Amino acid sequence: MEERILTQNFTQEDATEYSLRPRWLSEYIGQEKIKQELKIYIEAAKKRGEPLDHVLLYGPPGLGKTTLATVISNEMGVGIKITSGPAIERSGDLAAILTNLQENDILFIDEIHRLNRSVEEILYPAMEDFELDIVIGKGPSARSIRLSLPKFTLIGATTRAALMTSPLRSRFGVINRLDYYSVEELKEIIKRSANILNIGIDEDAAFEIARRSRGTPRIANRLLKRVRDFAEVKGNGYIDYNTANIALNMLGVDEMGLEEIDRKILIAIIEKFGGGPVGIDAIAASVGEDGDTIEDMYEPYLMQIGFLNRTPRGRVVTKLAYQYLKYPYVEQRRIEDV
């Protein structure tokens, strides 16, 4: 049971992704405030010989929550078990994981907001008292027994912290929000990844890829690898500014980092719904995309760059987006856009 929940097939692509991940806080680029706090918490926990307090990491996808969890395990010198909320279907699944942890180990649960409520309730005594309540038998003869667990650290990650229940969220002693990365930080990440992958790249090319990476390291590394493919097939393998610019344009990634689906979302709201306000379900139906995907993957960045507002009545495209997409903007439409 535990094997199914904790492991996946390890592909060559996974190996490449893993090689790009920093292993220590000193190698981790960006999120400076979080790193400084974690250094203190980790050093204090190690001095006391205790596990690190439970940690909740939240923010848009691709910002390094899983990577940061593995960095914490390395800094603490302990093992880490990685799973996800949807993978833990029954309380028995979680019990199997918890009882197989070693002292001071880290349990990382991605998408923790998607935990089954009955599973979540098993976590409460485990997080607070390092004890596990299990029920043996059924019906009138059923009885509950309490097992002692090794002390451990739970690191939860979520893109939608608002969907977590208050009892679960309140049990985390350390709560950090990961923010989008600056272009300069992404440029350093791209240069580091290029060095690991033996890719030749100049400063201007690294900056151009970073500029179009939506503030997200995962996207920056993905674009770097696709530009590398272009450079190897259409050029001499070296990535200069011209090569990067042509490749990114071919990929449909514009100067703001917008891709086809971003433009479809904005244009659909403008052309079909008068610029908004409009609900997420209507947007999803009009562009043929899942509503949760739009909320998790596309909407946060569009809001971050000021192209989309979320109001009580729905989503509204801003004047800035109208100007960028070269659509005429009618002022009286945008009473909500202030």
From Swiss-Prot:
Region (Large ATPase domain (RuvB-L)): 1-181
Residues noted as binding Mg(2+) in the record, renumbered to the chain: 66
Gene Ontology cellular component annotations, sorted alphabetically: cytoplasm; Holliday junction resolvase complex
Localization, UniProt: Cytoplasm
Span list, region Small ATPAse domain (RuvB-S): 182-252
Annotated region (Head domain (RuvB-H)), positions in chain: 255-338
Gene Ontology biological process: DNA recombination; DNA repair
Keyword terms, alphabetized: ATP-binding, Cytoplasm, DNA damage, DNA recombination, DNA repair, DNA-binding, Hydrolase, Nucleotide-binding
EC numbers, comma separated: 3.6.4.-
GO MF, one example: four-way junction DNA binding
Domain of life: Bacteria
Residues bound to ATP: 20-21, 62, 65-67, 128-130, 171, 181, 218
One Pfam family per UniProt: RuvB_N
InterPro entries, sorted: AAA+_ATPase (IPR003593), AAA_lid_4 (IPR041445), DNA_helicase_Holl-junc_RuvB (IPR004605), P-loop_NTPase (IPR027417), RuvB-like_N (IPR008824), RuvB_C (IPR008823), WH-like_DNA-bd_sf (IPR036388), WH_DNA-bd_sf (IPR036390)
Residues reported to bind DNA: 310, 315
Top-level class of the enzyme under EC nomenclature: hydrolase
Catalysed reactions, semicolon-separated: ATP + H2O = ADP + phosphate + H(+)
Sections of the chain in a coiled coil: none
Subunit structure: Homohexamer. Forms an RuvA(8)-RuvB(12)-Holliday junction (HJ) complex. HJ DNA is sandwiched between 2 RuvA tetramers; dsDNA enters through RuvA and exits via RuvB. An RuvB hexamer assembles on each DNA strand where it exits the tetramer. Each RuvB hexamer is contacted by two RuvA subunits (via domain III) on 2 adjacent RuvB subunits; this complex drives branch migration. In the full resolvosome a probable DNA-RuvA(4)-RuvB(12)-RuvC(2) complex forms which resolves the HJ.
Record family assignment: Belongs to the RuvB family.
Described purpose of this protein according to its UniProt entry: The RuvA-RuvB-RuvC complex processes Holliday junction (HJ) DNA during genetic recombination and DNA repair, while the RuvA-RuvB complex plays an important role in the rescue of blocked DNA replication forks via replication fork reversal (RFR). RuvA specifically binds to HJ cruciform DNA, conferring on it an open structure. The RuvB hexamer acts as an ATP-dependent pump, pulling dsDNA into and through the RuvAB complex. RuvB forms 2 homohexamers on either side of HJ DNA bound by 1 or 2 RuvA tetramers; 4 subunits per hexamer contact DNA at a time.
Free-text comment about domains: Has 3 domains, the large (RuvB-L) and small ATPase (RuvB-S) domains and the C-terminal head (RuvB-H) domain. The head domain binds DNA, while the ATPase domains jointly bind ATP, ADP or are empty depending on the state of the subunit in the translocation cycle. During a single DNA translocation step the structure of each domain remains the same, but their relative positions change.
Protein name in the entry: Holliday junction branch migration complex subunit RuvB
Encoding gene (name): ruvB
